[in-house]
Design a protein with these regions (language model features):
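Single conserved hydrophobic/aromatic residue that forms the stacking wall/gate
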Residues: 1-10
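A general alpha-helix detector
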Residues: 12-20, 36
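Phosphate-centric recognition/catalysis
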Residues: 230
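Canonical P-loop GTPase G-domain recognition
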Residues: 233-234
Length: 234
């Protein structure tokens, strides 16, 4: 009956809100999400259904798809080559590995010659790590010059790409253990030099609300165009 159907729907809504909070989703986002599904979940056809709980699950699934984006958006290559793309994120997010994987994807699926460039002069062996990953994936890597600053590496990369025929340059920026003023100032300077068509944030999905806060900080500093969530298979 109607009262039983309503009870089932309200119970599901409470469970959904609790599940989101336990998954480290912020209270604001959890409330907003439940409020979005509430009008549909309380619709007459749902209440009168023989299985209102299952119909609520479908509504939640549809809303999650809508929230995350129901359409695939391709990378933007709409610029005069070499096209620059900037990878940003905190240290340990998997940014360098993602940079190499993205380079391989572009070469294989988009048939474009890619060069990867490490701007991380702070983390020990960070530049060597990208060089090794480039060799493993057969991707061209900008040669390392010890002591060169990120801004100068950017300018050298742009010149090198024009000479070696690279159509896309992926710049792997330095990460930090936490966001600080120096980091953001450096990334802003890099953005001004390379004028990237894509600025992609790489974030660890297991950090929960931290990832959302990091995204806000980067969005306030640079023209963030996309996000890659690592470790999302767990």
């Amino acid at each position: 009956d109607r009262s039983r159907g309503l009870g089932d729907v309200y119970k599901r809504q409470r469970n959904i809100r609790l599940a989101l909070l336990e998954a480290d989703v912020s209270l604001e986002v959890a409330k907003d999400f439940v409020n979005k599904i509430k009008p549909k979940a309380l619709g007459q056809e749902i209440i009168r259904s023989t299985s209102p709980g299952q119909m609520v699950v479908k509504i939640v699934n549809d809303e999650l798809i809508n929230l995350l984006g129901s359409e695939n958006t391709d990378l933007n290559f709409n610029a005069v080559p070499p096209v620059s793309m900037m990878m940003v994120g905190l240290q340990g997010s998997g940014k360098t590995t993602t940079t190499a994987k993205l380079a391989k994807f572009i070469e294989k699926n988009k048939k474009k010659k890619v060069m990867v460039v490490s701007l991380d002069i702070y983390r020990p062996a960070a530049q060597e790590q990208l060089k090794l990953l480039g060799e493993q994936h057969n991707i061209n890597t900008l040669p390392i010059i010890e002591g060169q600053q990120p801004a100068d590496i950017c300018r050298r990369a742009l010149s090198a790409a024009s000479l070696n025929g690279s159509e896309v340059i992926l710049f792997d920026t330095a990460g930090r253990t936490q966001i600080d003023l120096q980091m953001m100032s450096e990334i802003k300077q890099i953005e001004e030099i390379i004028n990237p068509v894509e600025t992609i944030l790489v974030a660890d999905s297991l950090t929960g609300q931290v990832a959302a806060n990091v995204a806000k900080e980067f969005k306030n500093t640079v023209n963030l165009s996309g996000i890659v969530l690592t470790r999302s298979d767990g």
